[in-house]
């Protein structure tokens, strides 16, 4: 997972490390997935040596709900657009964790130290799997987590922005019902992105929420679902936020899996996703290689990593443009 500071050339990458497998019983608090922070000060041209943060992050929860295994969901770590405490705008990362599901951690020093959003006892998505975070226009934090046939959502509201205190709503499952395409029953992680937009029919300023997922019965047909956030009532609580999607755009017509996206400087959506699953031994230099056994447990190497630059008008069939 990666983020670049909005006011400098500093880049932070958070990576799972070591030789443990998240789902194995042998991976536990005494033999955990390791977590490494890797930093660049020149926009990614050069990188410093990795710094292990395993104990600093796992230790946040030792006195409340101890974690046996965890990692930061791959893709985008998001940096707040509105919350700045000290030198940096706040960054947030969603942990895939067991037992008791997702946790959200945040940092005000760009990943040198971390705290638990909502406190160490908070369990925002107890049934969650791989997850991502985003920010509403008013600074509240959304977590969106992988589940079969949809996404889990929850919403964090601050009581005190500076100290990070506040409260989570209840985890809520959304199935994007009413669409011709439905989220996959064999899911992967996707990405949420909320962009400032203009409704093209009348010029009204709104926000548009995007959520990418694979669709159908397998890991296929990665698509981006979209929903208008016209005013505060559309995001008054987690249920209002999760319900009532307006449409979707199918990015891939074939086998496709994990995805991530962010807003580019040119107001287009940078969309990254996995496509074209490569079976073990069929390609001499696969882009992604299974870990840690080489051939992996499912007899495949991995996928091609694909980048597309998409206009919001394309994703929403001309209904919105970025402002």
Q: What is the meaning of each model-derived region?
A:
Residues 1, 132, 260:
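Short, surface-exposed charged micro-motifs
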């Amino acid at each position: 997972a990666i983020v670049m500071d909005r006011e400098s050339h500093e880049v932070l990458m958070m990576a799972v490390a070591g030789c443990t497998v998240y789902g194995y019983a042998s991976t536990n608090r005494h033999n955990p997935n390791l977590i490494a922070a890797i930093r660049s000060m020149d926009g990614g041209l050069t990188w410093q040596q990795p710094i292990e943060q395993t104990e600093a992050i796992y230790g946040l929860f030792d006195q409340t709900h101890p974690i046996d295994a965890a990692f930061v969901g791959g893709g985008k770590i998001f940096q707040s657009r509105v919350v700045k405490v000290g030198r940096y705008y706040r960054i947030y990362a969603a942990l895939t964790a067991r037992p008791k599901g997702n946790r959200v951690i945040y940092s005000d020093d760009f990943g040198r130290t971390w705290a638990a959003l909502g406190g160490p006892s908070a369990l925002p998505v107890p049934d969650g799997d791989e997850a991502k975070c985003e920010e509403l226009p008013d600074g509240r934090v959304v977590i969106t987590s992988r589940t079969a046939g949809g996404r889990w959502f929850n919403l964090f509201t601050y009581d005190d922005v500076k100290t990070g205190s506040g409260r989570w709503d209840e985890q809520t499952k959304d199935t994007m019902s009413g669409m011709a395409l439905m989220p996959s029953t064999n899911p992967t992680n996707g990405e949420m992105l909320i962009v400032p937009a203009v409704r093209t029919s009348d010029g009204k300023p709104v926000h548009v929420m995007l959520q990418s997922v694979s669709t159908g019965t397998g890991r296929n047909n990665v698509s981006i679902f979209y929903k208008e956030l016209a005013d505060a009532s559309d995001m008054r609580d987690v249920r209002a936020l999760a319900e009532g999607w307006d449409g979707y755009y199918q990015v891939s017509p074939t086998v496709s899996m994990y995805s991530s996206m962010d807003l580019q400087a040119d107001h287009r959506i940078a969309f990254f996703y996995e496509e074209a699953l490569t079976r073990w031994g069929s390609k001499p230099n696969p882009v992604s290689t299974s870990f840690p056994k080489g051939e992996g447990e499912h007899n495949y190497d991995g996928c091609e990593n694909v980048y597309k630059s998409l206009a919001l008008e394309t994703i929403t069939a001309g209904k919105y443009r970025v402002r």
